[in-house]
């Protein structure tokens, strides 16, 4: 069809494509608007042009304009009003324009939720709801939801013979609570609501488990996902082998490897001819691949060591890839994979019915309370607009009313919203009146169940000439950014985005082209700052690796120093209003990050550089001292019999007791509640402390009475006034922010009391629920938009904004894979997937469906993260700075060099799909930039043609660990001495300080001995003593080392963490029979499903070493005497101090605590066995040398174990052994020798 676009006026500043978007009509229109392409201006102009054209006979209330946020809707209405006023100014007698200005306030310019609310208020009777309903906030909705769900589960538990429900509980919950089931129902409810018919989606979810008529996995609806994954990984294995062959073919390369490598490649290439219709054939083909032993090189000096190692490395990578394919997809027989799904069907059916019951109960409860939540709006509007799957009379009226429906940010629409929009637009394809604007490259709200495929489907079916289902118009000119920013973005994303991985091709239509005019200025090149965090590896079992936190600190300092440098050097920024350059200001700079976890470190780094800073953080509110103190006080007012909140209040500035006074109170009544001790102390003691307590108790009683009589806000304000706490925090550092936080607490209590919940008790429970669920409210905002500060925000928060200088931080932060590795997976196409739990055998298996959905979700996550990175880079107007830490730049750059020989512009699919962080993409893309080739001096790099200007800096972490300003400030006294200037040392407190400093405690030795010590700590202490000296006290205790939480245990675990993982597995291994490799692999899988071990821990476990143990004499003895074996035996034992420290003459005892790995307890004797994961092989000349060191290292530990177990059990410890997994070494310890 012809587009009938009127000619563009010669004086028009619009581009041809923009003009086309403004004028196109006669069919549905999709405008694919790239970042900074002026889409909002185009949308507003299109609307105004239609309204001022009197021949079009269009009124503003005949348009439906849908925006993504309320702020966008308000801006849209303002800009349309301004345009109409300008048109009226040029034609003041126009009755039509006067009518449009009058009608503007009645026009449907809003978010889709607001439009749905308008439908419901107007047609409430069609939905059978009370017209006086109140719209509630998400927090109140979640409180009602929790109550309803708890009630539903309680009801189900009370039904007799409810076998299906109890089987579901057993299959999907832990041993201690039904919290997992609670969470699962809630997640399924939310997920189902993104579908136009939630109940139909839940029923379809069950059908995916009906495999009675399916004879092969290849017939499963999600088999294409499996096929795609296998093909991708096979192709990656092939690429690994090609790289290995390339190294073998190099001069001085390991040519003898070629025959073996080429044979490997032939086998892999043969897989491209696979028979995909037969799962059995697939399984056999994969499992029959035979990697022959690689030949031994004679005369190794003839070969380049680097080429040899690289060839081996790539071949090993190919072998590992093929092994992973076999493990992930073919570890179970086909018939078992299908039967697992059929066995799960009853549970899924029960789960589906339970979610439907909850949905009905939840809505009924809201109806009884006269409330609706945001989720209800779309579905109730849909109910009004639909009648037997067709447009209702109401919908048809809207179709007649709206001459055009315009949607902004269309890429973030979900299926429910799409259905609503379809029902209010012209149903005729030939006369479509839907105008959609968006950019699928900026679709970053999949976590809100946005569906970018809706945009992509239209993008692929609509044609630029209008001949398809609609008209497609591409806006690729960018009017926001300098050429340097656009070149950098294009260079990176040409290599990253395609339909296969990113769900869209980054072709010439998608590329950004220059539309803005900036004066030429130097130093605007994109900067890539990489901070090398390389540290020496530690191997001993008891040492901890450096904390992950240091990365954030170093990166934050680097960014702060960069900003300080730009400010001091008056970095030039082009001012569009002044139309000239000016020196950079703090407000010109934004720091973007995927998450705000580094915000505290960033704030600290900015303080050191004296940079005003503001982090747009939505967390940390409840952790602030002033809010935590007030919450504790409110808990005590609600119920004083809560020891921890009461102690917090007493210790706080509100009461001001110290630790000694708290101890005295506890001694007044050693057992029972602390509040009873408080009352007892008050009654039996005459002191200043007792007076404080008496005043507090009286005050507390008054507040408790007030909480019953008055509302919550009155109570809070009364506390502020009576305690002067509000004024007190105002005098502390950051007082303005602290007072804002207390005002926010008052305001939030006021909001809470407007809900259907009331009273102090419920408010306290409400706050506790928020804290448990991690729904922090964020600290109160004290800065305005125009404050001259450096800002930090998430990439999501920055969408739609623009800044002169953008610093993208945290690029090496790992992607959040939590949802993908969750026990249960939800998918819009295939419903629900999880492992199969055999309730009788207590065994957990991954299902074929779970594996497939996991791969699908992983691909979707990768595509989403790629789009998030695109949003980050396109926020910059003039300068883009990319900052990241790397664990070891030399090793990291070698990994990037693997793609340096690629001649195709697009990076290999596996390289992009396996990325773990943004730096994986940026590094692999920029390695082919001429700047990197020059930096690394690597001839193998195949650079890509580009105009991108890139400055690369590699810095070491040591450059940022000591701040120069801090050091200079601390050295001022030394400068005074050098210059013969006086250094003030006189003080009125000098004599008092000297008296304290010279005081000697008579029993000082006791202060250096802990009342409680672990055996491991004692072992460390003694191992630090000189071997020839007498036993002496250590003057410093070892720093307490806490286990890193699982989410901080990255790819490389510390030696301690590896030891913990090995011990955990040894504790769980069955002794009923000698375990096989398959037994251990299945056990590890079960432990992962139960969150006992993580994937990283499991990869660190050496299964062969465990199997070797059970081949050893100790292992065989344990199997033979399995009924006598006890594992992980904890003990506590009081030991005289003099036995530990010979030079200390004290009549004191120390509590020794420890855990024995294993012991065999017979009738009269006990044998101790302790496992060790110390590195032996390759570290010592032989076992004799190692044994001597190990006996010295662990003698104290085993001696104390033996003494404690002997004293506690009354049985003699006949023998004690150390077993070293590395090398299968057994070492007997003589426990009769002294300490």
UniProtKB/Swiss-Prot annotation:
Which protein are we looking at?
ATP-dependent helicase/nuclease subunit A
Q: Which family does it belong to?
A: Belongs to the helicase family. AddA subfamily.
**Where do the annotations place ATP binding?**
33-40
Q: How does it assemble?
A: Heterodimer of AddA and AddB/RexB.
Report keywords, A-Z. ATP-binding, DNA damage, DNA repair, DNA-binding, Exonuclease, Helicase, Hydrolase, Isomerase, Nuclease, Nucleotide-binding
Name the residues that span the membrane: none
Source organism superkingdom: Bacteria
A GO cellular component entry from the record: DNA helicase complex
- Which organism does this sequence originate in? Listeria monocytogenes serovar 1/2a (strain ATCC BAA-679 / EGD-e)
Cite the EC number: 3.1.-.-, 5.6.2.4
Protein task: The heterodimer acts as both an ATP-dependent DNA helicase and an ATP-dependent, dual-direction single-stranded exonuclease. Recognizes the chi site generating a DNA molecule suitable for the initiation of homologous recombination. The AddA nuclease domain is required for chi fragment generation; this subunit has the helicase and 3' -> 5' nuclease activities.
CDD domains recorded for this chain?
DEXQc_UvrD
Q: Which NCBIfam families does the entry link to? A: addA_Gpos
Q: In this protein, which residues make up the domain named UvrD-like helicase C-terminal?
A: 509-800
Q: Care to name a GO molecular-function term for this sequence?
A: double-stranded DNA binding
Name the reaction it catalyses. Answer: Couples ATP hydrolysis with the unwinding of duplex DNA by translocating in the 3'-5' direction; ATP + H2O = ADP + phosphate + H(+)
Q: Does the keyword field hold DNA-binding?
A: yes
An example GO BP is: recombinational repair
- Residue ranges occupied by any UvrD-like helicase ATP-binding domain in the UniProt entry: 12-482
Q: Which cofactor does it need?
A: Mg(2+)
């Amino acid at each position: 069809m012809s587009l009938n676009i009127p000619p563009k006026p010669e004086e028009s500043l619009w581009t041809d494509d923009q003009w086309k978007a403004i004028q196109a009509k006669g069919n549905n229109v999709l405008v694919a608007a790239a970042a900074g392409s002026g889409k909002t201006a185009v949308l507003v102009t299109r609307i105004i042009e239609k309204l001022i054209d009197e021949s079009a006979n269009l009124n503003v209330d005949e348009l439906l304009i849908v925006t993504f946020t309320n702020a966008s809707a308000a801006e849209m209405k303002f800009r349309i009003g301004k345009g109409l006023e300008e048109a009226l100014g040029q034609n003041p007698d126009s009755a039509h324009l006067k009518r449009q200005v009058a009608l503007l306030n009645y026009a449907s310019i809003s978010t889709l939720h607001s439009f749905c609310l308008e439908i419901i208020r107007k047609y409430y009777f069609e939905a059978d709801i009370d017209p006086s309903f109140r719209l509630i906030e998400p927090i109140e909705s979640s409180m009602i939801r929790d109550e309803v769900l708890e009630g539903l589960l309680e009801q189900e538990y009370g039904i007799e013979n409810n076998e299906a429900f109890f089987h579901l509980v057993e299959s999907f919950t832990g041993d201690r609570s039904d919290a997992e089931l609670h969470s699962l129902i809630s997640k399924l409810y939310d997920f189902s609501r993104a579908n136009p018919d939630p109940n139909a989606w839940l029923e379809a979810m069950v059908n995916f488990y009906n495999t009675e008529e399916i004879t092969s996995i290849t017939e499963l609806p999600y088999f294409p996902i499996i096929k795609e994954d296998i093909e991708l990984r096979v192709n990656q294995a092939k690429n690994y082998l090609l790289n290995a062959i390339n190294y073998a073919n190099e001069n001085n390369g390991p040519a003898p490897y070629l025959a073996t490598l080429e044979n490997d490649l032939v086998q892999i290439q043969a897989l491209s001819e696979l028979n995909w219709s037969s799962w059995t054939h697939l399984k056999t083909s994969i499992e029959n691949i035979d990697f022959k032993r690689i030949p031994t090189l004679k005369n190794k000096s003839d070969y380049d060591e680097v080429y040899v190692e690289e060839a081996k490395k790539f071949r090993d990578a190919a072998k590992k890839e093929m092994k992973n394919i076999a493990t992930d997809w073919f570890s179970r027989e086909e018939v078992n994979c299908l039967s697992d799904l059929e066995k799960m069907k009853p549970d899924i059916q029960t789960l589906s019915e339970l979610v439907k019951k909850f949905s009905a109960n939840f809505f009924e409860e809201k109806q009884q309370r006269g409330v609706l939540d945001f989720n209800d709006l779309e579905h109730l509007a849909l109910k009004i607009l639909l009648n037997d799957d067709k447009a209702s009379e109401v919908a048809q009226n809207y179709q007649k009313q709206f001459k055009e429906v315009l949607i902004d940010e269309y890429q973030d629409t979900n299926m429910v919203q799409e259905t609503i929009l379809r029902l209010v637009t012209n149903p005729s394809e030939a006369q479509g009146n839907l105008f959609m604007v968006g950019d699928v490259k900026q679709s970053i709200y999949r976590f809100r169940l946005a569906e970018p495929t809706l945009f992509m489907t239209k993008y692929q079916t609509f044609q630029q000439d209008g001949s398809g289902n609609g008209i497609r118009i591409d806006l690729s000119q960018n009017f926001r950014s300098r050429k340097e920013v656009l070149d950098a973005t294009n260079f990176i994303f040409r290599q990253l985005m395609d339909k296969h991985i990113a769900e869209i091709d980054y072709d010439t239509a998608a590329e950004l082209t220059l539309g803005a005019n900036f004066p030429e200025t130097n130093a605007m090149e994109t900067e890539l700052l990489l901070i090398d965090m390389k540290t020496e590896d530690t191997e001993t079992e008891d040492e901890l690796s450096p904390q992950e936190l240091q990365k954030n600190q170093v990166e934050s300092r680097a960014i702060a120093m960069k900003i300080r440098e730009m400010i001091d050097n008056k970095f030039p920024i082009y001012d569009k209003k002044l139309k000239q350059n000016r020196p950079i200001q703090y407000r010109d700079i934004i720091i973007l990050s995927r998450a705000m976890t580094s915000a505290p470190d960033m704030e600290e780094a900015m303080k050191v550089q004296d940079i005003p800073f503001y982090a747009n953080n939505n967390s940390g509110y409840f952790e602030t001292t002033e809010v935590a103190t007030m919450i504790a006080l409110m808990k005590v007012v609600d119920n004083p019999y809560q020891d921890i909140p009461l102690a917090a209040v007493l210790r706080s500035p509100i009461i001001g007791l110290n630790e000694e006074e708290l101890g005295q109170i506890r001694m007044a009544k050693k057992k029972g509640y602390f509040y009873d001790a408080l009352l007892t102390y008050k009654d039996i003691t005459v002191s200043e402390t007792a007076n404080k307590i008496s005043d507090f108790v009286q005050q507390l009683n008054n507040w408790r009475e007030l909480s019953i009589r008055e509302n919550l806000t009155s109570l809070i304000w009364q506390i502020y006034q009576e305690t002067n706490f509000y004024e007190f925090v105002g005098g502390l550092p950051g007082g303005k922010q602290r007072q804002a936080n207390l005002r926010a607490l008052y305001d939030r209590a006021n909001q809470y009391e407007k809900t259907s919940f009331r009273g102090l008790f419920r408010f306290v429970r409400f706050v506790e629920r928020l804290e448990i669920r991690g729904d922090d409210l964020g600290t109160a905002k004290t800065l305005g938009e125009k404050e001259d500060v450096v800002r930090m925000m998430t990439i999501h928060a920055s969408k739609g904004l623009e800044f002169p200088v953008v610093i993208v931080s945290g690029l090496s932060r790992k992607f959040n894979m939590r949802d993908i590795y969750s026990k249960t997976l939800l998918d819009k196409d295939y419903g629900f997937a999880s492992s199969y739990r055999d309730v009788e055998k207590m065994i957990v298996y991954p299902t074929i469906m779970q594996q497939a959905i996991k791969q699908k979700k992983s691909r979707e996550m990768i595509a989403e993260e790629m789009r998030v990175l695109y949003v980050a880079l396109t926020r910059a107007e003039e300068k883009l700075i990319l900052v990241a830490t790397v664990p070891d730049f030399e090793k990291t750059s070698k990994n990037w060099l693997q793609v340096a020989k690629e001649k195709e512009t697009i990076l290999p699919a596996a390289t992009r799909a396996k990325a773990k962080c943004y730096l994986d993409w940026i590094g692999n893309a920029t390695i082919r930039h001429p700047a990197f080739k020059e930096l690394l001096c690597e001839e193998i790099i195949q650079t890509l043609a580009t105009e991108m200007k890139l400055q690369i800096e590699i810095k070491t972490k040591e450059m940022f660990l000591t701040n120069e300003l801090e050091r200079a400030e601390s050295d001022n006294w030394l400068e005074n001495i050098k210059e013969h200037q006086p250094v003030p040392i006189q003080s009125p407190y000098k004599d008092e300080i000297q008296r304290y400093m010279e005081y000697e405690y008579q029993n000082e030795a006791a202060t250096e001995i802990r009342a409680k010590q672990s055996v491991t700590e004692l072992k460390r202490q003694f191992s630090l003593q000189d071997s020839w000296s007498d036993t002496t006290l250590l003057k410093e205790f070892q720093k307490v080392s806490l286990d890193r939480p699982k989410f901080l245990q990255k790819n490389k675990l510390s030696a301690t963490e590896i030891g913990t993982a090995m011990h955990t597995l040894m504790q769980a291994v069955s002794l009923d029979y000698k375990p096989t490799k398959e037994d251990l692999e299945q056990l590890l899988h079960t432990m992962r499903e139960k969150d006992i071990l993580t994937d990283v821990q499991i990869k660190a476990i050496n299964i062969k070493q465990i199997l070797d143990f059970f081949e050893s004499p100790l292992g065989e003895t344990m199997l033979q005497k399995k009924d006598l074996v006890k594992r992980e035996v904890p003990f506590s034992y009081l030991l005289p101090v003099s036995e530990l420290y010979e030079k200390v003459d004290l009549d004191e005892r120390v509590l020794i605590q420890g855990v024995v790995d294993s012991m065999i307890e017979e009738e009269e004797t006990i044998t101790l066995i302790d496992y060790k994961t110390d590195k032996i092989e390759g570290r010592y000349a032989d076992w004799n040398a190692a044994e001597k060191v190990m006996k010295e290292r662990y003698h104290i530990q085993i001696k104390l174990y033996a003494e404690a177990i002997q004293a506690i059990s009354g049985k003699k410890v006949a023998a004690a052994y150390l077993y070293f997994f590395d090398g299968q070494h057994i070492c007997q310890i003589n426990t009769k020798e002294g300490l």
